[in-house]
């Protein structure tokens, strides 16, 4: 269980899911599978399903969560076991203790640990899932189960549900909406993750030197993550020069060259929660005139969008603000933006940002159903239908703001000095009652970047490269 989230908070999350389920229902959530890297037994490092982390903090593979609301009224607490009372029961299926397996892969919680440490009202060995689910399904009036997550566990569940395998609903859609607004404990973790990610970006910036490879900067970033108890929250992107034209370019062997920019998109994961930060800066430590002009347009669009964030604002409003600043700025540099010229998708082929949390591209709808007036729709009250509209931001939501420009080398509509330049600037924003709180803080303005890289260059010249260090550990 996470040291950052209390057992009572996990229990409250499960109670919210129970409250959203109708009486008589049964909800089943399966873990994601382990994935082979190569060979027959060499797997990628396992990362638990975000929904299971959210509901329990449980990090082991090959498990299943069951929310049993098949009691008569479904109104009792999940911790009530009094005879004759209707119960909501939280059940876990987990891998049993196995000395032969645990000597290789580490200690398991087992059935007893699932009950004592992870809040299960009842736990069973994963091999018992089919038998137990078959019994529970007979009483269920509604089944909530999303297949396609884990083929092995899917087969168990499908077999157990038998004639109730049709008409199932998705329990993860309910959890997704619950995950969208973060608790105080979650926000504290995400601020920490943002701090760690920011320190890593500063370290990479200070170690940027012509002749080094993209991989070298990736190593710096991920060392700082590990030093602070984290891992990379996604595959680290370090793109030198025109490699930035590929939005999710993986760090490679390309060499950093003076005159080029390097685009880094990298974040840390702390206790399951991600940061997601992008910075773009010149390898030499000094922007060219064209790089500076373009960079300041992108930065202005990001700052304008961030300044507008507050409860009640929508993604659509932010996108309009960002686009207006970008278009006006690019036009001022001689770009033919607009009809007959360049479109926004020509220069920025991605959205402005996304939700952030346990997943880098976190769950939760960006648009929601809005009711229309019954008089306009011609339908009686209580049977209103609506259309999808941008959902307004709420206090406690966390999102990224990441405008960018990616300019083709060959598109003659682009003024020649700017061709081949790729820039993305991304920060993590917490929506508060008073507006935006920026969780990330790596050098961002032209002046900040040049001064920081000057400092690193001076330290290197006076004391050698080792004096810069990357053993950067934040205080707890």
Predicted regions and their residues:
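Active-site neighborhoods and metal-handling regions in enzymes and metal-associated proteins
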Residues: 1-476
